[in-house]
A protein has these predicted regions:
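His/Glu-based metal-binding/catalytic segments typifying zinc-dependent metallopeptidases
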Residues: 44-102
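Charge-rich, well-structured scaffold segments of protease-associated domains
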Residues: 1-44, 80, 110-246
């Protein structure tokens, strides 16, 4: 099984080589042609990627671990890397994760219900996941869960505000500009873009794509993905005192 797995994936058709820096392209090409001459061409392993089955009506899951804090995650099926909804979701991620976010201000600062709060998006060739998460005192898990649901519902109904979108756009573009100053980071990003089918020039379109997202886009995407019927909730709590003493 390991040999078959290696044969299927470790082939030229599934590989991308990214070289950034002060190099001579002709010499680099010759070097890699020599080094990988014996690698089989193979075939693309992910031409037809199955989409995950949408979930609905799942009961919240709870786990008890040897931790002092409680952690809550509320997840939704997300977008794929090739989906036009991915960028509005990226902006929603940024707007929901910094110290100026509605979640931070309402849940942590105003209500004192969380230690940290944010959002994260995971994308692949198949639709991934979008998560809202927080850490809190185990005694506050019920009120903070209620408030988190309420804030997500408001986001699903109204999308981002003008201030949130402007801030998120500036953060996203600024962060990428800083990361791309590193040859290794820029090269890795371009390699992944090519592997995912976005093309080596995807970064050239990136700024315009982000700047073109409107408030209506965020409202449409939030309503599409953050449906309470398809929400998956997971909570991690400290050990149950009753069961631990028995």
């Amino acid at each position: 099984q390991l040999r078959e797995f290696h044969k299927k994936f470790a082939c030229a058709a599934n590989g991308v080589i990214s070289v950034f820096g002060d190099v001579k392209a002709e010499e680099v090409v010759k070097l890699f042609e020599k080094s990988f001459a014996s690698m089989p061409k193979g075939a693309l392993a992910f031409e037809n990627v199955e989409k995950p089955v949408p979930v609905a009506g799942l009961a919240p899951a709870t786990a008890h671990l040897d931790k002092k804090q409680a952690v809550l995650m509320l997840g939704f099926q997300g977008a794929s890397v090739n989906d036009s909804d991915r960028i509005p979701l990226e902006l929603i991620t940024e707007a929901s994760s910094d110290l100026g976010s509605r979640f931070f201000n309402r849940i942590r600062e105003q209500m004192g219900l969380a230690y940290f709060v944010g959002a994260a998006q995971f994308c692949g060739l198949a639709p991934g996941a979008f998560l809202f998460y927080l850490g809190t005192d185990p005694q506050k898990i019920e009120p903070v869960t209620k408030e988190m649901r309420s804030e997500i519902q408001d986001l699903a109904t109204n999308g981002l505000t003008e201030e949130e979108l402007t801030r998120a756009r500036a953060k996203l573009l600024g962060g990428e500009a800083i990361r791309n100053q590193s040859n290794s980071a820029f090269g890795a990003a371009v390699a992944v873009d090519e592997l995912m089918g976005l093309g080596v020039d995807a970064h050239k379109r990136r700024k315009e794509e982000i700047e073109n997202i409107t408030l209506d886009d965020t409202r449409r995407v939030a309503a599409k993905y953050f449906n309470s019927d398809s929400r998956v909730e997971a909570t991690v709590l400290p050990p149950d005192k009753k069961s631990s003493t028995n």
